[in-house]
């Protein structure tokens, strides 16, 4: 599951902290096209599975951005993303990207459009790691934050834009320590570093 912890985010459909409930996956892998296929391919690349897909639909609660069902220790084959998440990612895929000038030093706080994109891209990455078998929320969160740039680039963002979004996301949408989504190992060289041989972070 992908939580929201930034109090400043005022969009109703993206507000509040996410609970621990999971929605049920539907059997089979649907045949998607266009944007839906792009989401599937991101999930497949990150999870390392060819049999997974992403569905956009209403979650059990408006505060839940995404879910993956686990059957014992095994993940299902579908990630469910909330409609606001999918709408934001679709805009990115269509080339309607918000300016990231606000992420530069001295430019002040970014607007809701940038925050929404940061949450949405990291939510897809987070749930994709769940599809890959990562059940621990703190690990999925750390891996997802490190993969936000990958998600953005796969959804047609230029590499420089994607990297900037990834850096902004890591430092601005990280959860606090008391919700189960934070790990002290989520840092350069930590045990959750996806690329320990690289000095780049995230």
Predicted regions mapped to residue ranges:
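A metal-dependent hydrolase signature that marks the N-terminal structural subdomain at the beginning
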Residues: 2-109
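Short, intrinsically disordered, charge-biased short linear motifs at domain edges
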Residues: 39-46, 71-72, 126-130, 159-177
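Surface-exposed patches in mature extracellular/periplasmic domains of secreted proteins
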Residues: 51-56, 133-139, 153-165
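Acidic helix-start/capping segments at beta-turn-to-alpha-helix junctions
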Residues: 54-64, 145, 160-170
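Substrate-binding clefts and substrate-entry loops adjacent to catalytic sites
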Residues: 106-108, 125-127, 131, 153
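Active-site recognition of the HExxH zinc-binding catalytic motif
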Residues: 118, 122-141, 145
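Long, well-structured alpha-helical subdomains associated
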Residues: 153-202
């Amino acid at each position: 599951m992908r939580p929201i912890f930034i109090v400043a985010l005022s969009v109703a459909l993206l507000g509040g902290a996410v609970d621990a409930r999971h929605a049920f996956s539907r059997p089979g892998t649907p045949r998607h096209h266009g944007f839906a296929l792009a989401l599937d391919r991101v999930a497949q690349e990150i999870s390392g599975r060819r049999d997974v897909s992403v569905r956009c639909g209403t979650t059990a609660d408006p505060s839940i951005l995404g879910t993956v069902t686990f059957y014992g220790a095994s993940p299902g084959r579908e990630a469910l993303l909330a409609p606001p998440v999918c709408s934001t990612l679709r805009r990115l895929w269509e080339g309607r990207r918000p300016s990231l000038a606000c992420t530069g030093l001295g430019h002040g706080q970014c607007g809701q459009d940038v925050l929404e994109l940061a949450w949405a891209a990291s939510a897809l990455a987070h749930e994709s790691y769940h599809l890959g078998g990562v059940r621990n929320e703190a690990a999925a969160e750390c891996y997802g934050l490190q993969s936000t740039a990958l998600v953005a680039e796969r959804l047609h963002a230029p590499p420089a834009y994607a990297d900037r979004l990834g850096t902004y996301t890591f430092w601005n949408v990280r959860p606090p320590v008391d919700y189960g989504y934070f790990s002290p190992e989520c840092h350069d060289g930590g045990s959750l570093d996806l690329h320990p041989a690289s000095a780049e972070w995230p």
